From Swiss-Prot:
Pfam families: Ras (PF00071). It is found in: Cell membrane; Cytoplasm. It comes from Arabidopsis thaliana. Keywords: Cell membrane, Cytoplasm, GTP-binding, Lipoprotein, Membrane, Nucleotide-binding, Prenylation, Protein transport, Transport. CDD domains: Rab18. A motif (Effector region) lies at residues 41-49. It comes from the Eukaryota. A lipid is attached at C208, C209 (S-geranylgeranyl cysteine). This is Ras-related protein RABC2a. GTP binds at residues 20-27, 67-71, 127-130, 157-158. The gene is RABC2A. Transmembrane segments: none annotated. It is a lipid-anchor. SUPFAM superfamilies: P-loop containing nucleoside triphosphate hydrolases (SSF52540).
Length: 210
């Protein structure tokens, strides 16, 4: 399972959003997944995204993962980024109970308002399980809320990388089980190839593309 580069070296392309309160570890989760490193990061200002290519279920995937700011003043900025997302990861901090209750009070409502895809796959992720002694939300509570919201569920630690890859891989597998989302992922690749064709024609008069 490795990253690969190449403009059309993948079979499917999916857009995934990371949402949740500021400080729950969304950026750390993303950095841990992308680069296998763990860093203490400053809060994201606005929206950032990163791309990861990997193979899941025998398919080469390009995941464009959007990391949205959790601060209240940036919330309106994120509304357009829900458009076209095939997967949404709702992140909370298992040591901060308010980040868990906000999944319903704030983020669940935001998804209802802004998500344009009814079949979009959602996953509830409890981060910072490496701080078990400080836990304020039990695993059982997380599972119960995930059932209530019709979400997948996983606990992880961006710091130790426990379950980080599993989080994104399980979400991608679930997305591929939904025919309409699978079609969207395939169409995105075709659009990308068509977009690039004129570039190849002008830049290389006689050559072959890999």
């Amino acid at each position: 399972m490795g990253s690969s580069s190449g403009q059309s070296g993948y079979d499917l392309s999916f857009k995934i959003l990371l949402i949740g309160d500021s400080g729950v570890g969304k950026s750390s989760l993303l950095v841990s997944f992308i680069s296998s490193s763990v860093e203490d990061l400053a809060p994201t200002i606005g929206v950032d995204f990163k791309i990861k290519q990997l193979t899941v279920g025998g398919k080469r995937l390009k995941l464009t993962i959007w990391d949205t700011a959790g601060q209240e003043r940036f919330r309106t900025l994120t509304s357009s980024y829900y458009r076209g997302a095939q997967g949404i990861i709702l992140v909370y901090d298992v040591t901060r109970r308010e980040t868990f209750t906000n999944l319903v009070d704030v983020w669940g409502k935001e998804i209802e308002l802004y998500s344009t895809n009814q079949e979009c796959v959602r996953m509830l992720v409890g981060n910072k399980v490496d701080r078990e002694s400080e836990r304020g939300v039990s695993r059982e509570e997380g599972i119960a809320l995930a059932k209530e919201l019709n979400c997948m569920f996983l606990e992880c630690s961006a710091r130790t990388r426990q379950n980080v890859e599993q989080c994104f891989e399980e979400l991608a597998l679930k997305i591929m089980e939904v025919p309409s989302l699978l079609e969207e992922g395939s169409s995105a690749v075709k659009r990308n190839i068509l977009k690039q064709k004129p570039e190849h024609q002008t830049n290389t008069q006689s050559g072959c593309c890999s």
